[in-house]
């Protein structure tokens, strides 16, 4: 959502700048000489290892010979309002989903359909109460012992009057948060506060870093809460309303609106959460809003197809529907466990997390592993397609023709057309709009897109043997378009001297300059998390207590050092709850 630091204690704004998209020069005067520094989409880094065979080098030379047209990019102000609009739309989707469900429950009650009214209300209130309890617990962790409350005791310069005033303010905050969560508005408040902190991080020059920290943590919290509530409330609600419409052989407009709101909420939360994953990672390129919109339609169509097939099957086979869901959940959970995830601190927590992911896999694809996902995603969608075919075929064979002939053909077409449309949107996203560049590329030169003008191109050179490194070290392995490192002798001897190494052994900023830690840094005796995990969210929350202390007692930037490497990441670039 917001900007990263530039390595010198300056936050550029509410928009994403941590991948150097917004610091690109015009290139009007330097296009003929090309550039020797660019953002490489094939090796996940902002510096490439350029040899004679490098596609990046050929692309830059072609770019410098007359293709140096600067692509239009939104200004920081435009990005700010796009971010605000994204949050406002998330709030509207939230209110629409909850409001239509409550309205429908009241409508069932007036029609004396007490069973449907009770189930509809149950799937609204119970998930909301659980999420509000978790949200309030996080507030207590952040605001009590070890959190913000412990910071006051570290400063002896505060006067007694100031401490008394702070106590009154803290009491007001406690009362306000309690009332907010009692009325089930904790997520709404977090969305509003995220937008406020993002705007302040863009406008407040003196306190940008503190506003950015608070905004980043708040946005991560509200996305995690919305993801949890959506799969506890919207997914069961959608299946329930479709089953009611199919069993009663009629669809009222309020039922359709409620089902559409639940469907949109599922798709929106998944797209928003996926965008958050990339925006919060310093080693990932942020997702554009065009990519997020296509991702939204991908989820919208695939979930529609899945839920419609489940509802059709459940309208005829009540008991077998429950058996099918349990079997599918067990198979998906076993598949995830067999894949060897490494999210949680203990084995049993890991198994529990994988079981929760298995529930998500009943409705849609959800990536839980770092690395290539192509084959796993294809396998999942092949299984889902086969299941949808079997479920709809059984429904069509055992349905009551007298009551279903009016919509049977439309239902079958809807299942398979929605699935095909969702797969088409997925291919469009990965083929054209993926943040790391087109995944379905034919030309190798399409892996690189963004240029930083002003530096000379490496000269044309003949293949030569690499110069031995210090102390006779081996040649630095190159990283190809597939993301794998090549260490063969042929690669080492048939390349030019490297201009940049793929992975620097020293902490460097965006321009390749060594970063000298200005202030204290936190040592974490664990590997850096490579993909989001529920347990990592709580690890991050425990770190916040130290963060809240350091930002008050130290005027300099704090850093985080992980066990698995010497790279020093600024505190602002730490992936919150991921």
Swiss-Prot record:
Residue ranges crossing the lipid bilayer per the database entry: 86-106, 114-134, 253-273, 307-327, 348-368, 377-397, 410-430
Signal peptide: none
One GO term (biological process): phosphatidylserine exposure on apoptotic cell surface
Keywords on record: Cell membrane, Membrane, Transmembrane, Transmembrane helix
Origin: domain of life: Eukaryota
Membrane topology: Multi-pass membrane protein
Cellular component per GO, a single term: plasma membrane
Cellular compartments annotated: Cell membrane
UniProt-listed Pfam families: XK-related
Record family assignment: Belongs to the XK family.
PANTHER family, A to Z: XK-RELATED PROTEIN
Name of the protein in its database record: XK-related protein 6
